[in-house]
Amino acid sequence: IGHHAVLITIPGSDASLRPCLYMSHQDVVPVVEGTEQDWTHPAFSGDIADGYIWGRGTLDIKEQVFGVLEAAEYLLARGKSFARTAYLAFGDDEETINLGALAIAEHLKAQGVTLEFVLDEGGCKIEPGTAFGAPETSIVSVQLMEKGYADLELSVHSIGGHSSRPYGGTSLGRLSGAIADITRAPFAVRLNSAMTGAFETLAPYITEEPLKTLVR
């Protein structure tokens, strides 16, 4: 789809169930020219050594691409059937302009597909629960929501003139002020259902203040 994006469909047996989508991306961040010698193993070698696969993109995010494909192949090879249709979607330019993901989304929209859920990268590692006040507990964050974003285009019109006799400030100054106003107006912080559930689950393991008192 698009340039080199890939969309694989595994049909489900129950048409009443909305399909799910497992997503990742094939591309990786490039290696800066002149730094090739700084890598323990060649950046694109995929060397297997010391119990690890070495290379650019092994964690961002080739392991998820191969993990999803390996899991699907494993189940299908053993005759596993799916009640819910599953889509495996792999963009090819996530690190740059995301046209691959856009092409996949537009294709699914044109087909009238409404998804039950999307499983994407992020929060997929075991780490100490320090951020939750539970440093002695290991956690894996399951991210249930996605932050949105907005693109803003600001235009300023001002009276022309000479820098020696500015009239009412410069366009650049006014534009900078508008950008500063936006920066000083972040969205209000709120405790949503996902975070509430996380704290309720972790409450017995939280040992650090002030969270220890707040979750009791």
Give residue ranges: language-model regions.
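Acidic/His- and Gly-rich active-site-bordering loop/insert found
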Residues: 1-58, 65, 75-82
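Short, solvent-exposed loop/turn segments at the edges of secondary structure
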Residues: 3, 17, 41, 83, ...
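Active-site-proximal beta-strand/loop segments in catalytic clefts of secreted hydrolases
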Residues: 10-11, 24-26, 90-92, 121-123, ...
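Acidic/histidine-rich catalytic neighborhood of metal-dependent amide-processing enzymes
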Residues: 52-53, 59-141
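Aromatic-acidic/polar surface patches that form glycan- and anion
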Residues: 57-61, 168-171
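A generic structural motif
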Residues: 59, 158-164
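Acidic-enriched catalytic cores of C-N bond-cleaving enzymes acting on peptides and small amides
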Residues: 108-111, 116, 124-137, 142-151, ...
